[in-house]
Swiss-Prot record:
SUPFAM superfamilies referenced in this protein's UniProt entry, alphabetically: C-terminal domain of RNA polymerase alpha subunit (SSF47789), Insert subdomain of RNA polymerase alpha subunit (SSF56553), RBP11-like subunits of RNA polymerase (SSF55257)
Gene behind this protein: rpoA1
Membership in a protein family: Belongs to the RNA polymerase alpha chain family.
Listed name of the protein: DNA-directed RNA polymerase subunit alpha 1
HAMAP family: RNApol_bact_RpoA
Keywords: DNA-directed RNA polymerase, Nucleotidyltransferase, Transcription, Transferase
GO molecular function, one term: protein dimerization activity
Subunit note: Homodimer. The RNAP catalytic core consists of 2 alpha, 1 beta, 1 beta' and 1 omega subunit. When a sigma factor is associated with the core the holoenzyme is formed, which can initiate transcription.
GO biological process, alphabetically ordered: DNA-templated transcription
Function: DNA-dependent RNA polymerase catalyzes the transcription of DNA into RNA using the four ribonucleoside triphosphates as substrates.
One GO CC annotation: cytoplasm
Length: 323
């Protein structure tokens, strides 16, 4: 299968091999170049467990509760337990929705579950039977949960500036929709087959998850495509094309931007700082959902990196992506 030029001589295929139930699946990638399946499997596994984005509750405001150490009459769980239960609610948002408030209001006794949330179009609660609280006697119980799209497990993801109302409680959000990943490699003689076991929380399809992991990994290594050996032919450090300032190759995803700002830029296909600096203020303000607050945040990020808007860079994307 391999030749001296190390070129692939086959058309690879990715498919769902088996649905194991309980949001567990086997995804098959084949054929894979001999010796590459373990490398590919490890890369997919690490990206799936660390870098996919998803929706999660980031803060909650419970009626008649001032802080997380409060207790409620006729409620079995304390507030800490209620917040912990809210963290486990699996929420699926349609593309274009990156933040919203969910309301829950009941007057009953018994278990209050995720299915009691009032949802709107574009919002789906996957695990409707997830318990939130247990009411030992009939009583009113209501809360407002703020849901946001993010990446990675964020420690108290609702930063202090977002705790605007009295009684707002931050939730240690778990954005990653992937719960477990394993892989197995099968030798086919002149090629290999990679099988990836993926367990999700139900908010993402397995093929989409693996594909997104591959896309994200490719984005991260694409900045090295333009690396070249020095023209003097000496071994040692590999240099980036001298026409590009290395700071301009920094991915937007690596900046400390809010979810809204990051999503707006991503929707505009702004991948690197080098893409961003070529925009003017007026051009950025025309991007849907990007307001003055996001603009000021972006300008501060550029200042922190000794950059500014309105810079012209000829053929930047072509140089970066080797086109």
């Amino acid at each position: 299968m391999s030749n001296n030029n190390s070129k692939l001589e086959f058309v690879p295929n990715i498919q769902l091999k088996e649905d194991l139930g309980a949001f567990s699946y086997k995804v098959q990638l084949s054929p894979v170049e001999k010796g590459m399946a373990h490398i590919l499997g490890n890369s997919i596994r690490r990206v799936l467990l660390s870098s996919l984005s998803g929706a999660s509750i980031i803060k909650v405001n419970i009626a008649n509760v001032l802080h997380e150490y409060s207790t409620l009459e006729d409620v079995k769980e304390d507030v800490v337990e209620i917040v912990s239960n809210l963290k486990k609610v699996a929420i699926k948002l349609d593309t274009g929705i990156d933040r919203l408030d969910l309301e829950l209001s009941v007057n009953k006794s018994g278990v209050v579950s995720a299915g009691d949330f009032k949802t709107t179009q574009g919002v789906e609660i996957i695990n409707k039977d997830q318990p939130i609280a247990t009411l030992t006697n009939q009583r009113a119980f209501s809360l407002t949960a703020t849901v946001s799209v993010g990446r990675n497990v964020g420690i108290l993801s609702a930063i202090p500036t977002e705790l605007e109302r009295v009684g707002d409680i931050a939730v240690d959000a778990d954005f990653n929709p992937i719960k477990r990943v394993a892989f197995e490699v099968f030798d086919n003689g002149d090629s290999e087959t990679l099988e990836v076991f993926v367990k999700t929380n139900g908010t993402i399809e397995p093929l989409a998850a693996v594909t997104k992991a591959l896309e994200y990994f490719c984005e991260q290594i694409s900045v090295f495509v333009s690396l070249r050996v020095p023209s003097n032919g000496k071994t040692g450090d590999v240099l980036i094309d001298s026409n590009i300032d290395p700071i301009l190759l920094k991915p937007i995803d690596d900046l400390e931007l809010t979810v809204r700002s990051s999503n707006c830029l991503r929707a505009e296909n702004i991948k690197y700082l080098g893409d961003l600096v070529q925009y003017s203020e007026s051009q950025l303000m025309k991007i849907p959902n990007l307001g003055k607050k996001s603009l000021n945040e972006i300008k501060q990020i550029l200042i922190d990196n000794n950059l500014s808007l309105g810079v012209q860079i000829d053929n930047f994307r072509e140089l970066v992506e080797g086109k």
